[in-house]
Amino acid sequence: MANAHRRNNSLDKIKINGVWLTKEQDVREGIANAYHQMLSENAKWKADIRGLQLDHLSLQETENLELPFSEEEVCSALMEMNGDKAPGPDGFTVAFWQDCWDFVKEEVMEMFKDFHEQSSFLKSLNTTFLVLIPKKGGAEDLGDFRPISLLGGLYKLLAKVLANRLKKVIGKVVSSNQNAFVMGRQILDASLIANEVIDSWRKRKEKGLICKLDSYDNIN
């Protein structure tokens, strides 16, 4: 059964930009290069946002975001995480860190201390396994797959702790027009508002323009 499952999920060939890749090494390099190009930043141009009047945090809120990490804060974030997710390159699931917290907490807190003092971490900490999940049966083109990254447990924990800190203040700096990814707001509200706008135009026999953008935010 395991061998059959592996055969069904193996990727012997793939089409990238209209070109078929069949050799294992070519498939690996082709996929890696495609996503590297997709996710790379154009260093020649950056948007100038200095003239925008953006909401900002108070000095106290900014300082709170940069406080040293406490054991209670890290442990609380760890216990909130789903322990059953697939392990990353380090081979440890989140459940391992949860169950063995009393034994590993000193080393983990030392990692958080180094990160706080140096504002950086070892490159190996966020090493990932890139896994392609087919969006439909018979997927052949790279666009027919959805990539997911299997991250190590410690990197997930670090991200969780930082996210918990940001939750406390993010509502102050995110526009009230954004409905997604903010606690207390529902993405469905945006669809309802769009329908109301279209309905209003039709009733008043007015013309309008709606722009649907497939975009995402990033933090540099």
Please place each PLM-identified region on the residue numbering.
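Residues immediately flanking
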Residues: M1, P89, P134-K136, G153-L154, ...
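Structural signal for hydrophobic packing residues in well-ordered secondary-structure cores
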Residues: L39, A43, H116, L166-I170, ...
